């Protein structure tokens, strides 16, 4: 079978970049200095950044490294010319943004365009993706397609889609934000996605569907890889009942839970686990009963108003961590409230957690979902291998426009981060707390989210705190959400990690076109 018709497989990549070493396309950069664009004084849109965005788009279309390596990429001041399926003479053109659009973005103006399909999709996809929503690309109506066929051999993109992919995945808009909530977080209401009503759509992954359609139009013999839903469920162990706190005892008494009340009273005995610690075992077992995997994220922060301050080296906690290890359940990290924007505090807590969890690859998320662009850099400095913080506390949805794990681009450093981002989509307290949804509406909202993940072959991610099981309505809702997630494939983050951190093509020398 020829590379052009081979069914694409998940790319394999080497340690510090994006593209697979076998998939180094021919790169021609014509007058590379002219190909660099700027948004304000600090953000440079370089040829390597555009190649990164092109790969992120291509892999979301199901493009294999074998197919990608046959392409020729020519980058010039006016845009990127992509020769795909070269034996057939097929070409795709991605224009660079006009200077006036870059000036708009420099003024923090964020125009949003709506685009249509090249070819009408099937009704199931059409229901989920009626059009393409394209931020940072100028304004237009949905009558103009995202990709326009100028002949049977050439297709042109009608916006600077590579810039859009780059800015959305890198969270550029958060770098210029001036308003934050009382925890220093970028709130959903400040995002262009919330303001324009597309926070619950994985727009970057939807561009992959459009690009897949373009490739099929140019070469009907080509087929993308099958898209399958995967799931990664996790539990933030904010509270484990150690050290003993009277308010926990009072909480169980008020709820009328005799079992948990006595567990809290006798939790100091050697063989009795406090109710919150026991809940770690319980929530893992509940999740596994639906044939789904869990991960538990532990803390090592000192006591504070926002941190319970337990010691992960406590013998009872170690006993649960050992049990998780024996059960094949991942244990990860949850750096405390004060580690946000504090790399030194972060390093101290990670070092403590490594003493308990071991020296292997570790991932997790920030406590309180406190995240900013520097978080990627700080986690990278600590040797952490994946982050799963990127979600709004106050609204479910696709903060990064994607449900497909990816290697983030660091705009400030003009390079990819040496870690994987596994975007978080749903948190327990978001549904019943911040959004004030009832159980039925919560299930409906998550079901829509899962349907969109399935359509693009993404990873459905959700965090449910261990002690949430103490509350009947949270326990009831969790089991209902597990039921609609049941059947999703396991997300193998270690395999994804080894394939994602590959040999970056922008580090290789490029031939200069004439």
Place the predicted regions along the sequence by residue:
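A subset of signal/propeptide-processing and intrinsically disordered low-complexity segments
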Residues: 7-11, 329, 382, 389-392
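Conserved hydrophobic/aromatic pocket- or pore-lining residues that grip, position, or stack substrates
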Residues: 236, 334, 379
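Terminal accessory/targeting
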Residues: 1-312, 404, 411-514
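Catalytic domains of cell-wall/extracellular-matrix polysaccharide-remodeling enzymes
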Residues: 64-65, 74-78, 337-416, 462, ...
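Metal-dependent polysaccharide deacetylase catalytic core of the NodB/CE4 family, i.e.
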Residues: 239, 243, 263-264, 281-371, ...
């Amino acid at each position: 079978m020829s590379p052009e018709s081979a069914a694409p497989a998940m790319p394999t990549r080497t340690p510090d970049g994006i593209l697979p070493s076998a998939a180094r396309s021919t790169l021609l950069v014509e007058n590379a200095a002219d190909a660099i664009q700027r948004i304000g004084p600090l953000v440079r849109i370089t040829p390597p950044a555009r190649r990164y965005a092109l790969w992120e788009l291509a892999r979301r279309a199901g493009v294999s490294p074998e197919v990608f390596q046959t392409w020729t990429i020519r980058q010039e001041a006016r845009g990127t010319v992509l020769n795909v399926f070269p034996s057939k003479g097929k070409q795709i053109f991605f224009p660079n943004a006009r200077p006036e659009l870059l000036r708009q973005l420099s003024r923090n103006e964020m125009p949003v365009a709506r685009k249509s399909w090249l070819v009408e999709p099937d009704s199931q996809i059409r229901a989920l993706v009626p059009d393409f929503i394209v931020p940072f690309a100028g304004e237009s109506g949905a009558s103009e397609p995202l990709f326009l066929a100028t002949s049977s051999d050439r297709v042109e993109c009608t916006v600077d889609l590579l810039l859009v992919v780059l800015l959305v995945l890198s969270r550029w808009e958060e770098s210029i934000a001036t308003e934050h909530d009382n925890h220093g977080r970028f709130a959903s209401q400040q995002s262009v996605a919330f303001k324009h009503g597309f926070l619950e759509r994985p727009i970057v992954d939807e561009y992959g569907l459009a690009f897949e359609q373009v490739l099929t139009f140019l070469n009907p013999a080509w087929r993308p890889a099958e898209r399958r839903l995967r799931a990664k469920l996790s539990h933030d162990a904010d509270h484990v009942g150690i050290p003993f706190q009277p308010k926990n005892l009072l909480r169980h008494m008020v709820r009328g839970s005799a079992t948990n009340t006595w567990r809290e009273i006798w939790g100091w005995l050697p063989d009795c686990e406090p109710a919150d610690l026991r809940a770690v075992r319980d929530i893992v077992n509940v999740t596994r009963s639906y044939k789904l995997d869990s991960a538990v994220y532990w803390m090592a922060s000192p006591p504070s108003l926002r941190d319970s301050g337990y010691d992960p080296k406590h013998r009872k906690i170690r006993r649960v961590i050992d049990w998780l290890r024996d059960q094949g359940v991942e244990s990860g990290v949850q750096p405390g409230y004060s580690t946000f924007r504090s790399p030194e505090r972060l390093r101290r807590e990670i070092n403590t957690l490594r003493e308990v969890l071991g020296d292997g690859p570790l991932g997790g998320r920030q406590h309180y979902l406190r995240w900013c662009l520097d978080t990627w850099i700080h986690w990278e400095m600590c040797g952490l291998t994946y982050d799963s913080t990127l979600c709004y506390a106050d609204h479910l949805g696709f903060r990064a426009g994607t449900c497909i794990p990816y290697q983030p681009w660091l705009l400030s450093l003009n390079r990819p981060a040496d870690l994987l981002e596994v975007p978080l989509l749903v948190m327990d307290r978001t549904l019943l707390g911040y959004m004030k949804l009832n159980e039925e509406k919560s299930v409906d909202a998550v079901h829509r989210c899962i349907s969109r993940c399935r359509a693009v072959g993404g990873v459905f991610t959700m965090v449910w705190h261990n002690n949430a099981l103490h509350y009947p309505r949270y326990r009831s809702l969790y089991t209902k959400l597990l039921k609609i997630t049941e059947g999703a494939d396991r997300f193998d983050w270690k395999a994804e990690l080894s394939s994602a951190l590959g040999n970056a093509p922008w580090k290789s020398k490029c031939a200069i076109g004439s």
